[in-house]
UniProtKB/Swiss-Prot annotation:
Gene: atpG
Source organism of the structure: Cereibacter sphaeroides (strain ATCC 17029 / ATH 2.4.9)
Oligomeric and partner information: F-type ATPases have 2 components, CF(1) - the catalytic core - and CF(0) - the membrane proton channel. CF(1) has five subunits: alpha(3), beta(3), gamma(1), delta(1), epsilon(1). CF(0) has three main subunits: a, b and c.
GO biological process, one term: proton motive force-driven plasma membrane ATP synthesis
Job of this protein: Produces ATP from ADP in the presence of a proton gradient across the membrane. The gamma chain is believed to be important in regulating ATPase activity and the flow of protons through the CF(0) complex.
Protein name from the UniProt record: ATP synthase gamma chain
């Protein structure tokens, strides 16, 4: 049975931990608001660009003049998986859920005889994936020095992907991230970015005149579209990370409070037992006299 001193030290230690988790929860809440605002501000542009490109892609179709980013290489042998996770932990199952989805996708491709290459964005994903898929790694993007996510970061990642695609290093690129829904709900998502995939009808291209041509405009927009998709994914990931961390720290704070209550009850019982024992000894001594 722990001594009163040990129990008192444990109570003090848990109280200090609760202060830390509460502070982290408040910081995550503030960062979450900023991340949500950034994600919401980027959506109209991304949706409009997607609508225009969808309409152009529908007009261009699978013609011989279709841009390579739309038509693809004609093969799907080599797949590049871009796995986006956080630089830090203490955010519940946020990182592991994205890694789990990427790992399952890689296993499926390998079973089909495909070649898999992995590019990680964020420290935590690299740490987890290197354990069993280290031989498939081709690069890593370090975001530890990025204080606030901006479009130039997405442009840099997109430029790297486009250069690798032009060099023939892969046929299909898919990004993995968590789509933000709420503080307690972040959905792991896989989204193909190269070659471009469009759903729906989008803007009707016949309503516009494109110069020099629809193919030329689409060829210019597609690289921007890749960067925009990556930027949107990074923003969604950022909001999801802060939401997950806020939820995890809230749970940790509550658990710390419950533990303090249990330890306090145990401390009081032990103290009461010690006092009772001393009283019994005093009374017994008095009776002996």
């Amino acid at each position: 049975m722990p001594s009163l001193k040990d129990l008192k030290n444990r109570i003090g230690s848990v109280k200090n931990t609760r202060k830390i988790t509460k502070a982290m929860q408040m910081v995550a809440a503030a960062k979450l608001r900023r991340a949500q605002e950034a994600a919401e501000a980027a959506r109209p542009f991304a949706e409009r660009m997607t609508a225009v490109m969808t309409g152009l892609a529908g007009s261009v179709g699978s013609s011989e003049s279709a841009p390579r980013l739309l038509a693809g290489t004609g093969s799907d042998k080599v797949h590049l998986l871009v796995v986006m996770t956080a630089e830090r932990g203490l955010c519940g199952g946020f990182n592991s859920s994205i890694v789990r989805l990427a790992r399952a996708h890689a296993a499926k491709l390998l079973t089909q005889g495909k070649t898999v290459k992995i590019l990680t964005v964020g420290k935590k994903g690299r740490e987890q994936l290197r354990r069993d898929l280290g031989q498939h790694f081709i690069g890593h993007v370090d975001l530890s020095e990025v204080k606030r996510m901006g479009y130039p970061v997405a442009q840099g990642i997109a430029r790297d992907l486009l250069d690798r695609f032009d060099k023939g290093e892969f046929d299909v690129a898919t990004i993995f991230f968590a789509r933000f829904q709420s503080v307690i709900s972040q959905v792991p998502t896989a989204q193909q970015v190269i070659p471009a995939v469009f759903e729906g009808e989008g803007e009707v291209s016949s309503l516009y005149d494109y110069e020099p041509s629809e193919e030329g405009v689409l060829a210019d927009l597609l690289p921007r579209g890749v960067a925009t998709q990556i930027f949107t994914a990074l923003l969604e990931n950022g909001a999801s990370e802060q939401g997950a961390r806020m939820s995890a720290m809230d749970n940790a704070t509550r658990n710390a409070g419950d533990m303090i209550n249990r330890l306090t009850i145990e401390y009081n019982r032990s103290r009461q037992a010690a006092i009772t024992k001393e009283l019994i000894e005093i009374i017994s001594g008095a009776e002996a006299l």
